Amino acid sequence: ALTFLEEQPQVDPNRLGVYGHSMGGKLTVLTTGSDDRVKAAAPSCGGISDRYNTDPLFRTTIGDDVYLSRIRCPMFFLSPANDFHGRINDLQEAIREVQSPEVRMNCAPHHNHQDTPDYEVATQLWFDQHLKKNFEVPETPSTKLMLREKRRPRFILVPDRSREILSVDVYYTQQGEIVDGPGNMDNTKNRFWHHVKATPGKADWLADISFVNPNRPLWIYANVNYPLEKEVIGAGYYYGIYKADHFTISSPMTMLDSDRLKKLGLADTFKTSAIIEDFSEGWEKEWFHYRENEWARKTHKVYEPRWQAPDGAMLSFEVRTREENTLVVGIDHFAAEVKINGGEDWQKIVLNPGQFTDADGAVLKGWGKIKELRYGPSETVRSKERGSKKRKSFGGPWKGVKPQLRDLRWGVK
């Protein structure tokens, strides 16, 4: 492919770039690590985690680490924090293995194998800098985690201030697995990332970590968000067109195991909470979506021990919308429809597991081991039976403005 491009009259053979998503991300790394005609590359969701295969032939021919260590051109890794194919802990190895002095990354919290425009746009900006020479991507922020005896951890970040900074968001999880191979997919795809909004100082930004259990590992990183002078339009994942007015640069992730946290005498500030979401300012940072123009949201809060359901609990929340509607609430591959009366008054909704059904008509047996909570106007769930093509749709078109929600919690009868 590179040779073909070199021979085209409209192509500058000295400015060839490679990017790809998923298996295309792996192929980006393999191509870039084997051909120095590539002048810049941007692998997405791949090319960093094929390092666990013990077969000698695999390890020496198509293992990701073999090719990463041969790369010397500028690299930008697009690596969602919960991606199953390019795992965020392996990214930390990858950025050390690459031999290029020009390496950046972005890591969308909660996302698995998809991204939103503020992350997707990085590929275009990277090539604008290194192939077109008409843009400058900020440097990777430097970070330091202060662990203070009997006090809360403090994360300190020094971002590149060559551009205006919109905000700095710190994310941490205590559900990371240090040995995180392909056999641990549930954790990889569903671990919950707590959000802390960093506050600016004279040169750095600070974030104090509120809830920490020293008996569990701690993974923490930061996203620095920058505005774009003008909107950028491009082709994103799965052939979708995106429009971005800002972009994100991530820091490397600090990873500490529980033994180190305990040795340091870190204060145990972990507390369980029946309140899953209070919908106060910034709440959406701990929820996620993939479609910018829709209001449906998802979260992995219910997978985190802090918000796991107590025995005999009911899921409750209050909702208000002007029009009569049907709201869909989803739990993993189950869903339930909720009738909303409409009007100015808040309506309390109480749900038990038996109200949630799957594509095969089975009901949710309990809240134990649930991983994802969702709400939206409609959704289709798919059967988990091997070989089954059964699907079941819930909800439908929404009337009027999006709903308001408050006081999402576990309640006991």
Give the ranges of each region predicted by the language model:
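Catalytic histidine neighborhood in serine/cysteine hydrolases
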Residues: 98-115
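Gly/Ala-rich beta-loop-alpha elbow adjacent to hydrolase catalytic centers
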Residues: 20-24, 28
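Short, aromatic- and glycine-rich surface loops/edge beta-strands on solvent-exposed regions
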Residues: 213-229, 371-376
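The feature captures the conserved acid-bearing segment of alpha/beta-hydrolase catalytic domains
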Residues: 40, 46-98
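Short beta-strand elements
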Residues: 229-272, 399, 404-412
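Gly/Ser-rich "nucleophile elbow"/oxyanion-hole loop immediately N-terminal to the catalytic nucleophile
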Residues: 1-21
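Extracellular ligand-binding interfaces
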Residues: 275, 287-369, 374-391, 398-404, ...
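Surface beta-strand/loop "capping" patches
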Residues: 128-172, 194-200
